[in-house]
Amino acid sequence: MKKQEGEMTFLDHLEVFRWHLIKSILAIVIMAVLAFVFKNFIFDTIIIAPRNPEFWTNRMLCKLAELLNTATLCINQHPFKLVSPELAGQFTIHITISLLAGLILASPYVLYQFWTFIAPALYQKERKYARTTILISSALFFIGITFGYFLIAPFTIFFLGSYSVSHQVENYISLMSYISTLASVVLAGGIAFELPVIVYFLSVLGIITPTFMVKYRRHSIIVILIVAAVIS
């Protein structure tokens, strides 16, 4: 830790942390309020969109289906109806999604506040590695959730929404169930793309070695294929 940081007392650090925390909470609240106001964009354009025929992925797959002369790829052309079986269901979901959206939208600012708090305690070399790690991790996570949202989610929604064990059983899909499934799929994509960073840190800590990875590469390929099959 740098000398000037060593001169600060515990209460001084606590006061600095308190202000960073207050700023982060205010940012989350402001973003949550904006998300609450723009509910049509949040729900219609982002959350519910993957089940609609007009969604980008669904349109592209239909065009590909026309070129290949097969209707199999043309998915989500008859979207299922979403229901809210509880009286306060839609309002509760609106509040919950607004808070989550606020946290997501404010996350860059929250990370910045966290960084400005810990950065003075790091040496220049440590700052460089930390910045690089944060940037790479953030980029991979963003790519992962984009992949999950635009590619995995439409197929998952189509498969689960149209799956039937009997023609006598009709799907009764709640809005909360739909959102939960969509969030799980998108988050899984983000976490999956973080694997290179996780493997790197495990390698640095000596938990995973190059010899270990070479020895069990075939096993890892099988596991990846199984997980990919389950997700897709």
Locate predicted features.
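Membrane topogenic/interface segments and analogous intrinsically disordered interaction regions
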Residues: 1-232
